[in-house]
Structure formats: structure tokens, C-alpha cells
A protein has these predicted regions:
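A glycine/proline-hinged amphipathic helix-loop "lid/cap" segment
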Residues: 1-80
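Alpha/beta-hydrolase superfamily serine-hydrolase fold, recognizing
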Residues: 65, 69-75, 79-312
Length: 312
């Protein structure tokens, strides 16, 4: 059912498996503390977390190589048949402050298996131990390296949550620079406004089992550093219309029980207004980055649509 020319509601009610996953998640220790004070205390006392290791079976299932860009680790996975026609540069989420989660690896595998793509995963250094500039340098260097051996128009930028922010920010930097451009942009529940300024987000917060507005604002300030979190540089939702008009075809997937749904709708509308081929797919009662739970009906539909987008 189409609600607007650019927004498509993909489910009217959640699958039983997704409801079960949400119930389990709601009873676990949250990924991020739920109050600003708890988050600040956690960040001040934490031991720097490490990236979840890639499952050992991946080495048998895919052709895997590890390399460095901007002094940081990068992993590339090809199907056993060899490098694919399309190469996905995928940035994992984690609020810029958390490394690769174990749940991200099955999503990487599912994208390779369903879409037949090669995938490169930058394992970027996190803030505040590192900085936004270090993360941006890695993104820039990784794309430049891939573009040396692969047609840039056959590179798709992808990311979830803060990783969606990184993919989009990279696309905007490349557009402004005017050099080689990626062919497509796929965003899973992207974080678009670090300040979480829209009051409508407050109505979604009671339904979001992962994210809280105050904690996200703290993460955003930490990532922005000396910059203004509300600037177009830090919050792509506020990028200029001129810059947005330069973006490649874009698809966005966000659950309706995700704080980011409000800004996803606004951003898709902005892209449409400036002439970008953009679509937003929404899922009833789906939580933040629901597609990482790959056995669910909703995740399978996301991957189906991603495959169709790549094939267009």
C-alpha cells in the first residue's frame, strides 16, 4: 500500500518471530544505557570494546581478505565464484561509539547470499577514543581503494544506523568533490539528525526498545566534537538541497518502532523534492535495525527489495 509516491508500507503487522525477538530484546541489558547520565558514566569508565570477530565459517564460505585503509582494518568478502558485478561498501552501526556487533556478521552474509554482491566492511575506530575525522578518513580511503579496481558506478554504499550516517556522509563528500561517484545508496535505519530535534520523535520513544533520545544526543555530541551537531556536515538531514540533489538513487528501510522513522520520512521527502530517485520502506512495529535479525519475514523482505534495487 502506497502512502505517498516515495513511501511504501511493507507490513501491516509484525511477524510472530519479530514480536518474539522484540520481547527477548526488551528483557536484555540494553545496548546503550537508557539515560544520559548512565551513558556518560558508562563512557567515562568503559574499557575500549573490540569488534566482534568474523565467524570462522566465513573463511570457508567466502573468499575473505583483510587490508588497511587510513591505518584501520578493512575486511572484504567475495562469493566463492569470485568478485561480483556489484561491490557493497558497508558501514556497521553502533552510535559511532561501539564497534562491530556479532549480529552484523549474519547480515553481511545474508546480503552476499541474497544479492550476489561482494561486501567490504571497514572496522573503524570508535569515538571518543578516536574521532569523526579518523572515521571519515577510513571511509574516504576505502572507497578510493575500491574505485581503483572496480567501476565506481557498480559500488553501492550501505550502512545501518550510525553506519547509515557514515555511508550517506561519504556519498555527500564524494558528490561535493566531483570525482568518482557510487552508483547507489542503501540505508538501513539511518541516523540523520544527531540532535534528534523533531518533537514528533517523542511519540515514538515509548515504542523503541533500543534507543533513547537523551542517549543519542550524547552520542551525537561525542561524535561531532568541536563541530555543531545540528550542522549539515554532522546531520545529513540538514544538508543543502544542492548537495542532496547530487546523490545517487537511494533506498531507505526503517521500522515504525524506531526513533529514526520520523527523520527517515522527512529525508526521503527532501530527496524526492530535489529530484533524487528515493524510496522509503516502512515495517509495522519493527525495531531499530530489524533487518539484522535475518530469519524474520521483515528482514527477508528487506533483502529482497535490496536485491531488486541492485538489479534495477
Amino acid at each position: 500500500m502506497l502512502t505517498t509516491p516515495i513511501t511504501q508500507i511493507r507490513s501491516q503487522k509484525p511477524s510472530l518471530l519479530l514480536k518474539t525477538v522484540k520481547w527477548v530484546m526488551s528483557r536484555r541489558t540494553p545496548v546503550f544505557p537508557h539515560t544520559s547520565a548512565e551513558f556518560r558514566e558508562y563512557m567515562a569508565s568503559r574499557t575500549l570494546p573490540l569488534d566482534a570477530p568474523m565467524p570462522s565459517k566465513f573463511a570457508q564460505k567466502y573468499d575473505v581478505s583483510e587490508w588497511e585503509a587510513a591505518g584501520q582494518k578493512v575486511v572484504t568478502l567475495h562469493p566463492k565464484s569470485g568478485p561480483a558485478e556489484w561491490h557493497m561498501l558497508y558501514f556497521h552501526g553502533g552510535g559511532f561509539v561501539r564497534p562491530m556487533f556479532k549480529e552484523h556478521w549474519p547480515l553481511v552474509a545474508a546480503m552476499i547470499d541474497t544479492c550476489g554482491v561482494s561486501v567490504t566492511v571497514p572496522l573503524y575506530e570508535v569515538v571518543p577514543e578516536s574521532s569523526h575525522q579518523v572515521q571519515d578518513d577510513l571511509a574516504d580511503a576505502a572507497f578510493a581503494k575500491l574505485a581503483e579496481s572496480h567501476d565506481p558506478q557498480k559500488i553501492i554504499l550501505n550502512g545501518d544506523s550510525a553506519g547509515g550516517h557514515m555511508a550517506l556522509s561519504l556519498a555527500l563528500r564524494l558528490a561535493r568533490a566531483g570525482g568518482p561517484q557510487p552508483g547507489k545508496l542503501a540505508l538501513f535505519a539511518p541516523w540523520l539528525d544527531l540532535t534528534m530535534a523533531d518533537p514528533a520523535i517523542e511519540a515514538v520513544e515509548p515504542h523503541d526498545i533500543m534507543l533513547k533520545i537523551g542517549t543519542l544526543r550524547e552520542c551525537g555530541r561525542m561524535f561531532a566534537g568541536a563541530r555543531d551537531p545540528a550542522s549539515g556536515e554532522c546531520s545529513p538531514l540538514f544538508a543543502s538541497s544542492e548537495d542532496l540533489s547530487l546523490l545517487p538513487p537511494t533506498r531507505i528501510w526503517t521500522g515504525q518502532h524506531d526513533l529514526f522513522i520520523v527523520d527517515s520520512r522527512k529525508f526521503a521527502a527532501r530527496l524526492n523534492e530535489v529530484g533524487v530517485d528515493a524510496k522509503l520502506y516502512e515495517y509495522a512495529e519493527a525495531p531499530h535495525v530489524f533487518m539484522a535479525v535475518v530469519p524474520t519475514r521483515e528482514a527477508k523482505d528487506t533483502l529482497k527489495l535490496l536485491n531488486e534495487f541492485i538489479a534495477e
